[in-house]
Amino acid sequence: MFARLITVLVCLGFSATLLAQTGHPAKGSWSGDLTPASGSASHVRLLLNAKNGELTGSVNPGKNGVEMSKVTLDAATWTMTINAPMKEGALVLTGKLSNLGSWTNRKYIGTYTMGNQKGKFEFIIN
């Protein structure tokens, strides 16, 4: 009888962790490439934070990182737009978040402009 009680308590403990939320699906460290219509791709890292319902972050975080000026998310379509003032010109990333249930395979895919440059991008959560 005692063993059954312990088994039930352990199962309840595991089920509680399954119900726990992991946070905002856009939050985290993302890496990927900006691929212009002509020319070679540039590797980029994004660091996104979520606090009080707002998204903030930086592009290529670190010593030479650039703070995002605006991040918007349309939760109905999971379309996210990121704006950042890069030295090459204003960066605007517009794309969709996908694989939201995955811890390791979430993607952010779309198109971008940076100054006069236009192209596609694909980021994956790290």
Task: Give the positions of each predicted feature.
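Bacterial N-terminal signal peptides that target proteins for export
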Residues: M1-L9
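Central antiparallel beta-sheet cores of small beta-barrel/beta-sandwich binding domains
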Residues: Q21-N126
